[in-house]
């Protein structure tokens, strides 16, 4: 009996520690090539082996994807390869040939090598949570990399409510068929019509955890950065997005994707705004899509914590 109570107390203490644990999230108000390098260096994680920098290449020139000029210095400092996957809906990135033309139009290929991860096929990663998806389908080139910088543009999203590092790790790293598998909550890798919203969000969280776990193997690692600029209610996958109504906020980074996305959401929801600076459209987009649930479910899966310590590097 004493042994039982001792084990119980240890378990309760561990649960209490986990509930109170905080992850560090670094923050700068400056959005520049220099500040992007500075906030990455604040993480104190040194890359090893071949480095992937996961970005979104943007559906059109009207999309609000991160500019090559902004990311060039960081990517070149780590000798990184820009990585992306083809989309699941045709358009300018629906196959590798048109996607490479899009990449060239954006100028990404002028700053670093660019690898379309699913250009030669796809592989399956195991998932911890099989409620909806039973594996995560990603580009077959992913095992070529030892270190990933998940470099996301934080903004709204038509389906997920918002897009940050969790979406960039899940939908972003998924192959074309893998994207459909997540969107359909494990029903199909082909065209889907309608999915329960929470099932889709929970599938994203499970897929993000699969990618995180892959890069937490011995000899590998992953870090996360959100750039909070040009925050339209629409994703960079939209070729004709709404104009941003919210002013730029800065760059945030962490080794914990849950804490990072939560910190960005908190900045948006607590923002007072003013003339020409209106957070309400983005807040409405997040709320109507139940977007916060992705973060909540990712925490439930053990991917990270919503408790964070925001550290300014300015």
Regions found by a protein language model. Give the residues of each.
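Extended, low-polarity segments enriched in aliphatic/aromatic residues
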Residues: 22-314
């Amino acid at each position: 009996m004493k042994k039982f109570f001792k084990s119980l107390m240890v378990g309760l203490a561990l649960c209490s520690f986990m509930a109170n644990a905080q992850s560090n999230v670094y923050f700068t108000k400056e959005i520049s090539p220099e500040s992007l390098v500075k906030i990455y260096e604040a993480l104190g994680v040194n890359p090893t082996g071949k480095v992937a920098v996961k970005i979104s290449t943007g559906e059109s020139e009207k999309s609000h994807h991160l500019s090559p000029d902004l990311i060039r210095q960081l990517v070149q400092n780590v000798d990184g390869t820009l990585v992306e996957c083809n989309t699941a809906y045709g358009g300018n990135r629906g196959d590798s040939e048109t996607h490479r033309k899009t990449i060239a139009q954006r100028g990404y290929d002028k700053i670093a090598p660019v690898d379309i991860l699913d250009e030669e096929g796809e592989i399956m990663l195991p998932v911890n949570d099989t409620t909806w998806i039973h594996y995560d389908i990603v580009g077959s080139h992913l095992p070529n990399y030892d270190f990933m910088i998940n470099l996301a543009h934080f903004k709204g999203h038509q389906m997920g409510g918002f897009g940050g590092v969790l979406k960039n790790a899940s939908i972003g790293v998924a192959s074309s068929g893998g994207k459909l598998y997540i969107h359909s909550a494990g029903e199909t890798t082909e065209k889907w019509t309608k999915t329960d919203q929470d099932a889709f969000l929970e599938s994203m969280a499970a897929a993000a955890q699969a990618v995180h776990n892959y890069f937490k193997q011995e000899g590998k690692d992953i870090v996360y950065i959100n750039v909070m600029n040009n925050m339209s209610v629409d994703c960079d996958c939209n070729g004709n997005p709404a104009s941003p109504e919210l002013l730029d906020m800065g760059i945030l980074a962490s080794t914990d994707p849950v804490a990072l996305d939560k910190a960005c959401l908190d900045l948006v929801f607590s923002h007072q705004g003013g003339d020409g600076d209106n957070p309400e459209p983005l807040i409405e987009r997040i709320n109507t899509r139940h977007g916060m649930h992705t973060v909540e479910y990712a925490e439930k899966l053990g991917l990270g914590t919503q408790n964070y310590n925001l550290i300014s590097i300015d």
